[in-house]
Amino acid sequence: LPTCKSVISFGCRFPVGTLLCKSDIPYTRVRNSITPKMDAIALDFCIAMEKYQVICVPVPTNESQWDNNTGRWRSIVSQKHAAQAAGLGTIGRHSLLITPEFGSMVWLGMVLCVQEFEPDKIKEPICDHCNLCVDACPVNALEKPELQQQLCWDYAFGDDEEKQTWRIACHKCRDICPYNLGTQNFIS
């Protein structure tokens, strides 16, 4: 959107119970259910704003394209960086957004808008770089300062050939994070 003046970021809580399951089915199913929900919220918002002659564009929650320059998958705009700039939370060592309310258990949506809005205050960093996520990563995708995205994704996402289904098979960095419930719900 060439005339974009604001990015509106929003989040939906991701159920923590999915981290406790031995099966990867609940986590995958919830992720696959939340994604279209977030896209629908963004679309409905854009349609509603047009009643006020405000042009907005929904950014797809999960669709991305390969960037040969960086060797990473990229969306139109980085959801987590936009959410951090919008004051929803801060990005942790594991490269996930951590919010005070929901920790890293949040799924993000975004809308680009031609209307300029007052931004929220940027949050103070939550992650203290304890490196539990670095130590827990089975493929060492967090050893460098920046997530080695393809290494992570090749291990975490894929097909279960036996069951002929697509699964999210790893979320150890999210499991181990002491702030996966946020700071307001932190349990020591």
Give the positions of each predicted feature.
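Non-catalytic, usually N-terminal nucleic-acid engagement modules in DNA/RNA processing proteins
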Residues: 1-31, 35-36
